Amino acid sequence: MSFNHHTIEELHELLVAKDISAVELTKATLEDIKAREEAVGSFITIACEAALKQAAALDAKGIDPDNVMSGIPLAVKDNISTKGILTTAASKMLYNYEPIFDATAVANAYDKDMIVIGKTNMDEFAMGGSTETSYFKKTKNAWDHSRVPGGSSGGSATAVASGQVRLSLGSDTGGSIRQPAAFNGVVGLKPTYGAVSRYGLIAFGSSLDQIGPFAPTVRENAQLLSVIAGSDRKDSTSAPVQIADYTIKIGQDIKGMKIALPKEYLGEGIDPKIKETVLAAAKHFEKLGAIIEEVSLPHSKYGVAVYYIIASSEASSNLQRFDGIRYGFRAADAKSLEDIYVKTRSQGFGDEVKRRIMLGTFSLSSGYYDAYFKKAGQVRTLIIQDFEKVFADYDLILGPTAPTAAFELDTLNHDPVAMYLADLLTIPVNLAGLPAISIPAGFADGLPVGLQLIGPKYSEEVIYQVAVAFEATTDYHKQQPMIFGGDR
């Protein structure tokens, strides 16, 4: 029996009433994963034994009637540390790495008696926008298996969209939660930088990375964020902000709220069908009583260039720790210490990772630092100031999540610049450290289209409030792909 059409609250009621046990729910989830895995390829590791052991222990202890997450399975992106469960970052470099500690986000989930069911596929070290750079496999879009799921958190998105799991965790450095959420018709949120601890997240761009939730609905997304968020002494970038319940404003009226629509987000490079969907959503918000006005974010056009200098520079530094000495892959034919370093990194990293390491090393090198990295930091400040000016007068910003719907497999993975430009609408949010959500807003040629709502720092509750207002008066989130029992 499958329970994947039940909401978290419905599952909780079944567990509390003992109509099902945690073991039965876990077994059913494992069956859902197995039944769909060949078609979509969401997982790198399925933690059957560990999950069933945890579920049995929970049944013996008893489900907490006051904890809606008690006994709920959770899929975790494979760059988030899980004690005793392989954490590979989808790289040959870490193909056999089994952490001895949990990431804080995972530990928080365990504290709420959630059950980690497996680790999801991703772009190698989270570097990519299509989940095609994984060392292990290519994940496929839940709606059309000839298309990409987005990236880098593609596996976490398809696991939810295809009905393998109800909830999952991803990470977002330049759009890696929101873009795959848009491509697969699910809800994905990138929290404010520092709202969720980065302890245990394998670092890509340390000033940009953020762990966040995927779910089929806005409420369930907010419920999962309430579990994983919070300040953490183990993370020096963790914000001293503690919000117990991110669902607190869900259901409140949005009448009179001012929402900005940047003209740059509907300009050159945006598919006309995506633009049409976003404008229709804007009109829908007006019917709900919100005030929609056009604004300008003039420096957002520089976001992609700024991002790939800063992110690659930070990556070149962060990835220096992978050298074949203490853990992970080591080249077998090395004859000296220098040989170990050179051959291990040459053989262990994929092409995209090596490309970004080289770009970052160049940007940080003597004679080029001022022209590239320092200049990128200055333009980043201008992007931040653009957002601050808008949020002085508006509650939220509205726009598309991605310039197109999901593209076909093997079409952009050999064109790095085209792949990078696919993130032009999500990258500015990371550069500014802001929260943003992608929610289902329609379809273009049968493929899901995501709507992005961006807020000032620590405004997640308001974002959820507005997102639910849209979700509750539309049915896009209810439409499911054929693999999940839908008719598309």
Curated annotation (Swiss-Prot):
Subunit and interaction comment: Heterotrimer of A, B and C subunits.
Record bears the keyword Nucleotide-binding: yes
Class of enzymatic activity (EC top level): ligase
Catalysis performed (reactions): L-glutamyl-tRNA(Gln) + L-glutamine + ATP + H2O = L-glutaminyl-tRNA(Gln) + L-glutamate + ADP + phosphate + H(+)
Role noted for this protein: Allows the formation of correctly charged Gln-tRNA(Gln) through the transamidation of misacylated Glu-tRNA(Gln) in organisms which lack glutaminyl-tRNA synthetase. The reaction takes place in the presence of glutamine and ATP through an activated gamma-phospho-Glu-tRNA(Gln).
Domain of life: Bacteria
Active site per UniProt: 77 (charge relay system), 152 (charge relay system), 176 (acyl-ester intermediate)
Biological-process GO terms, alphabetical: translation
EC number(s) on file: 6.3.5.7
Family recorded in the similarity comment: Belongs to the amidase family. GatA subfamily.
Key words of the record: ATP-binding, Ligase, Nucleotide-binding, Protein biosynthesis
InterPro entries assigned: Amidase, Amidase_CS, Amidase_dom, AS_sf, GatA
Name of the molecule in the record: Glutamyl-tRNA(Gln) amidotransferase subunit A
Organism of this sequence: Streptococcus equi subsp. equi (strain 4047)
Gene Ontology MF: a single term: ATP binding
Entry GO terms, CC: glutamyl-tRNA(Gln) amidotransferase complex
PANTHER family in the record: GLUTAMYL-TRNA(GLN) AMIDOTRANSFERASE SUBUNIT A, TRANSAMIDASE
One matching Pfam family: Amidase
